[in-house]
Amino acid sequence: MRDIHEEILQRLFALQDLEYQTFQSKLIPGISPESMIGVRTPALRAYAKELSRRADVDAFLAALPHRYFDENQLHAFLISLGKDYHLTVEAVDTFLPYVDNWATCDQLSPGIFRKHRVELIGEIWRWMASEHTYSIRFGIGMLMQHYLDGAFDPSYPERVAALRSGEYYVNMMIAWYFATALAKQYDAALPYLEQRKLDAWTHNKAIQKAVESYRITAEQKECLKKLKIKK
């Protein structure tokens, strides 16, 4: 009888799309094309739902590190389907050190977190305090996803603005956070740009992404353009 890991690899290769593999490898720097099988995201999501109903799926989740990028994507989707909050946080903590690219990081989005925002915020600060690039990025992403609407607190952007990193994928997420904050909490987010609380690159990138957004008014866009730091 085959173990689940062998079965999963066979299924992933059966779902392989070589044209997509070539396309995808160009989007994710630092990941070797040989580690990409080339499974499209909808197929991975569907397979994750199928696997999530199996009692032996934990054997796959425990088999870290995975060899293939697609296994990591599948792993992220499986965690995202978790129904128990505390077990899901544990699964995230186990997996994050092995996340080595923006795509897997950004696909990791547990639905159960929506029901546990009171407890989640402490975990977010912990992830943001990590020295691991994608743990920090994940923490900022969760803050952006869950705390810019009804659960927003004006002190939260200060925690993001205080971050300093030499990592492109951390700074890009900080910019994305503030661009989204400008769309959802404009009056609270604007002072961070007016007072130049971000480093110059992240400041300008946040403005660029905000100006590109359909959720920002024309008047707001004109205001933001004037705040760009000239080189």
How would you label these PLM feature ranges?
Residues 1-231:
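Alpha-helical scaffold domains
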